[in-house]
Structures are given as structure tokens and as C-alpha cells.
């Protein structure tokens, strides 16, 4: 049902890449621009993610991003992280586009 422009996909993937790079480098500050200030992670404040990534430090992991759907100003992506400190994860991120561009509003994840 996507009606997005190529620019939307590029901006969505950029937000995802900021998150992935922050995970890989163990740098919560690096991923902050990808997230809305009121974003949540599994229902908790997003600062939990930033603090956890920084505390964990760099990780030798691989990631894949799939844009599942984009409709007007909302999108859903799936991020698969392999070997993030020895575990594999699947995330779903809900994004919303506003005057500041595409921002992740919510992140849910599970270990697989």
C-alpha cells in the first residue's frame, strides 16, 4: 500500500542506519537523532536504549533493514541484528514523518 517517494525511503533508511551505527559503535548519542524525543522501547522511555548501547560498548554485529510499508507520513521497518553480543534480534520500528523528517516513534524487539 506504499505511496512513498524515493526520498522517503532514503530518509527512513538513514534513520535506521543511525540506530544500527550506534549499536555497532556502542554509542547511544549517535542514534539519538533517529528517534523522536518521546519514543519508546518495548514501552519504556527511549533513554533506556541510549544508556544500554553506551554501557554495552562496541559490537561486532551485522544488520539488515526491511521497509515493510510506508503510507503518507507513517512507516514500519524491520531490523534484523545478527550476533549482537552473541545473540540475534528482530526489531520492529514505527516511524512518523514531521517537520523534522522521519523519526522512530517506537521500537519493539525480541531475541530469536
Language model segments and positions:
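Short beta-strand edge/turn micro-motifs at domain boundaries
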Residues: 88-112
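Feature marks short, surface-exposed loop/turn motifs that line or immediately flank catalytic pockets
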Residues: 38-39, 112
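Short, low-complexity N-terminal intrinsically disordered segments enriched in polar/charged residues
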Residues: 1-29, 33-37
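Surface-exposed, charged secondary-structure patches
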Residues: 4, 8-11, 40-92
